[in-house]
Amino acid sequence: MAVERTFSIIKPKAVTKNVIGAIYTRFETAKLKIISAKMLLLTIEQAEGFYVEHKNRDFFTNLIQSITSGPVMIQVLEGENAVKRNREIMGETDPKKALAGTLRADFGDSLTDNALHGSDSLASAEREIAYFFKFDEIFSR
């Protein structure tokens, strides 16, 4: 199996619920190492640049309002098949459709406030990691 890196955001509503530690425990239990992390308050410009591929979608405005409503916790995760593994533990985008025991089922409230963002491919992971992290801020362990 290939060791990969993926990108994750714990969204503002989940941050305000004080579940960062619980989510980090789930990452580590799933053998996803946290190799870099930051807490940020995204500007509208940062959020629009990050989610640029959704610019023409109906939900774009709500997404930007939600992701900039408070601090986010961003992290780089590393492990075997990290992109797929992270997507599996996150669960479906809509927390109401996510399987019990997944992060979104346990910590998400709605389609917009679904607790987390995770890269959907290796190419996305590379782009998203580079958007927020410098090379010398990431430490494999």
Swiss-Prot record:
<dbReference type="GO" id="GO:0005737">
    <property type="term" value="C:cytoplasm"/>
</dbReference>
<dbReference type="InterPro" id="IPR036850">
    <property type="entry name" value="NDK-like_dom_sf"/>
</dbReference>
<comment type="similarity">
    <text>Belongs to the NDK family.</text>
</comment>
<dbReference type="Pfam" id="PF00334">
    <property type="entry name" value="NDK"/>
</dbReference>
<dbReference type="GO" id="GO:0006183">
    <property type="term" value="P:GTP biosynthetic process"/>
</dbReference>
<dbReference type="GO" id="GO:0006228">
    <property type="term" value="P:UTP biosynthetic process"/>
</dbReference>
<dbReference type="InterPro" id="IPR034907">
    <property type="entry name" value="NDK-like_dom"/>
</dbReference>
<feature type="active site" description="Pros-phosphohistidine intermediate">
    <location>
        <position position="117"/>
    </location>
</feature>
<protein>
    <recommendedName>
        <fullName>Nucleoside diphosphate kinase</fullName>
        <ecNumber>2.7.4.6</ecNumber>
    </recommendedName>
</protein>
<comment type="subunit">
    <text>Homotetramer.</text>
</comment>
<feature type="binding site">
    <location>
        <position position="93"/>
    </location>
    <ligand>
        <name>ATP</name>
    </ligand>
</feature>
<keyword id="KW-0479">Metal-binding</keyword>
<keyword id="KW-0067">ATP-binding</keyword>
<comment type="function">
    <text>Major role in the synthesis of nucleoside triphosphates other than ATP. The ATP gamma phosphate is transferred to the NDP beta phosphate via a ping-pong mechanism, using a phosphorylated active-site intermediate.</text>
</comment>
<dbReference type="GO" id="GO:0004550">
    <property type="term" value="F:nucleoside diphosphate kinase activity"/>
</dbReference>
<feature type="binding site">
    <location>
        <position position="11"/>
    </location>
    <ligand>
        <name>ATP</name>
    </ligand>
</feature>
<feature type="binding site">
    <location>
        <position position="59"/>
    </location>
    <ligand>
        <name>ATP</name>
    </ligand>
</feature>
<keyword id="KW-0597">Phosphoprotein</keyword>
<keyword id="KW-0808">Transferase</keyword>
<feature type="binding site">
    <location>
        <position position="104"/>
    </location>
    <ligand>
        <name>ATP</name>
    </ligand>
</feature>
<dbReference type="InterPro" id="IPR023005">
    <property type="entry name" value="Nucleoside_diP_kinase_AS"/>
</dbReference>
<keyword id="KW-0963">Cytoplasm</keyword>
<keyword id="KW-0460">Magnesium</keyword>
<dbReference type="InterPro" id="IPR001564">
    <property type="entry name" value="Nucleoside_diP_kinase"/>
</dbReference>
<keyword id="KW-0418">Kinase</keyword>
<keyword id="KW-0547">Nucleotide-binding</keyword>
<dbReference type="GO" id="GO:0006241">
    <property type="term" value="P:CTP biosynthetic process"/>
</dbReference>
<dbReference type="GO" id="GO:0005524">
    <property type="term" value="F:ATP binding"/>
</dbReference>
<feature type="binding site">
    <location>
        <position position="114"/>
    </location>
    <ligand>
        <name>ATP</name>
    </ligand>
</feature>
<dbReference type="GO" id="GO:0046872">
    <property type="term" value="F:metal ion binding"/>
</dbReference>
<keyword id="KW-0546">Nucleotide metabolism</keyword>
<feature type="binding site">
    <location>
        <position position="87"/>
    </location>
    <ligand>
        <name>ATP</name>
    </ligand>
</feature>
